Regions:
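Conserved donor-binding/catalytic loop of nucleotide-activated donor transferases
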Residues: 208-210, 229-236, 240
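Glycosyltransferases and closely related glycan-assembly transferases
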Residues: 31, 49-55, 65-78, 90-92, ...
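Active-site proximal beta-strand in glycosyltransferases
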Residues: 55-58, 72-101, 118
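A short, active-site helix/loop in glycosyltransferases that binds the activated sugar's phosphate group
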Residues: 112-137, 177
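Membrane-proximal helix-turn-helix segments that form the acceptor-binding/catalytic region
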Residues: 96-117, 126, 208
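Conserved catalytic-core segment of nucleotide-activated headgroup transferases in glycan assembly
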Residues: 144-206
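N-terminal pre-catalytic "stem/leader" segment of glycosyltransferase-like enzymes
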Residues: 1-64, 238-283
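Nucleotide-sugar-dependent
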Residues: 215-227, 232, 242, 246-248
């Protein structure tokens, strides 16, 4: 019986970040499909774990030890990339044309030896390919949501919003650039409100009461879950070219059309992961 280990720095019961929320859906679906799927925080993974499992899905791995990373390179694993952990600072946006010097690239062999490096969008994948010269990069072109969240977004599509209002995400993370989004709204005398950090369903219900999302990140967003959520709720978006989602063909969709598309894409993403790491899934 094949055994699979899912590795991540944090899980959704610890941090409600976009990567963790995506991983929670992926992990749940893998457990519905495969016989044995366990999960461990990256800092707890030991060399003995590398021998105890047959397959590995590595999400965020900042806290994974060098010994374990080196050992995994002889194993069957994929990297489910949420940012750019081959860079010292994980941010290609600090370099001209997103091109770092060779001295700032780390973990290269860990990416080279993976069966696949799954990226969130074509934009994300192009940056990774350009910087690492890999031929194992796969663009997923989407994200994963639980059905409950899709249902809430469907509900918010029907919400009567009235006058034009602008949403700004209140984030303590500097590169999310809340301050510039506020300045943009105030300079144009737009009616805006701050959407505060909160649990996902409440966040969606709050965000969905506005007509437009203003999101102006300073760094490349591999996809931007919140921008896609806004589009799925029928909202307009004011963003920058740093958003991975806006470069996808499906970004012209919005509302129920985009929700239906993302539901289908979610199934395709999960199937893609299974096909690549398990070939035809667990036999």
């Amino acid at each position: 019986m094949s055994k699979t280990l899912f590795i991540a720095d944090f899980f959704a019961n610890q941090i409600l970040g976009g990567g963790e929320l995506n991983d929670a859906v992926l992990l749940e679906r893998l457990r519905q499909t495969l016989s044995v799927v366990d999960a461990l925080p990256s800092h707890e993974v030991r060399l003995s774990d590398c021998e105890a499992y047959d397959n590995f899905i590595v999400s965020n791995f900042v806290n994974l030890s060098k010994k374990v990373k080196d050992h995994l390179q002889s194993k069957n694993y994929v990297i489910y990339e949420h940012d750019h952990k081959y860079l010292v600072g994980r941010n290609p946006g600090v370099y001209p044309n997103f091109e770092p010097p060779a001295s700032d690239i780390i973990n290269r062999q860990f990416y080279v030896k993976a069966r696949a490096v799954f990226c969130q969008s074509n934009f994300h994948a192009a940056i990774v390919k350009a910087n690492l010269g890999l031929d194992n990069v796969v663009s997923l072109g989407g994200n994963l949501w639980p059905e409950e969240h899709f249902e809430v977004m469907e509900e918010m599509c029907k919400y009567s919003r009235g006058s034009t209002t602008y949403a700004v995400i209140q984030s303590p993370v500097l590169h999310k650039n809340t301050s510039e989004a506020v300045q943009y709204c105030e300079a144009l005398q737009l009616e805006y409100g701050l959407v505060l950090p909160q649990e996902p369903v409440s966040f969606l219900r709050d965000l969905g009461t506005y007509t437009t999302l203003v999101f102006l990140p300073k760094t490349p967003e591999t996809l931007s879950r919140v921008v896609v959520e806004a589009r799925m709720m029928g909202m307009a978006t004011k963003t920058t070219s740093n958003i991975g989602a806006i470069h996808e063909e499906w970004f012209t969709k919005k509302g129920l059309d985009l929700i239906d598309y993302m539901r289908r894409r979610q199934e395709e993403i999960i199937e893609m992961v299974l096909l690549i790491i398990f070939e035809k899934g667990e036999e």
